Amino acid sequence: MGGIFGTISKKSCVADLFYGTDYNSHLGTRRGGMATYSEDKGFVRSIHNLESSYFRSKFEPSLNKFEGCCSGIGVISDTDAQPLVMNSHLGQFAICTVSKIANMEQLEAEMLSRNMHFAEMSSGKTNTTELVALHIIQGKTFREGIENVYHHVKGSCTMLILTTDGIICAR
């Protein structure tokens, strides 16, 4: 299990993102991550291992690097290191997911047979969030890509996508 949080503000969103993501800490104990966007800084991301420490103690010392960003997503995950920052024909975006994909191995094999690759590994397995992101970028738009995910995935998948224009939520 895990939890995700997203926020957009007219001023810095860092405090809201930090506390909103931390609120989900009871849902996962493996990894925590945040990604923000601003025109000045672009995408800023941080991921920490939470297996031996709490979200707050890991992220609090480095919150200043996110300062000035007005949109962001955060995740507490019991599986994958995330959010991931991608660059594709859809533009740059950050993505985090909470999912239980029953046909993960099948989808992975299909992607590999089409000469796709996976750059992120989690405990020796393909990163689920990267698999979802690769299905999204198969679409001509984010909407088509998200529909592609739900057309192929057996199981559940909730996602937040941080773009240069805002946040897309899908479940």
Where are these regions (language model features)?
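Conserved short alpha-helical segments that host acidic/polar catalytic motifs at enzyme active sites
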Residues: 1-171
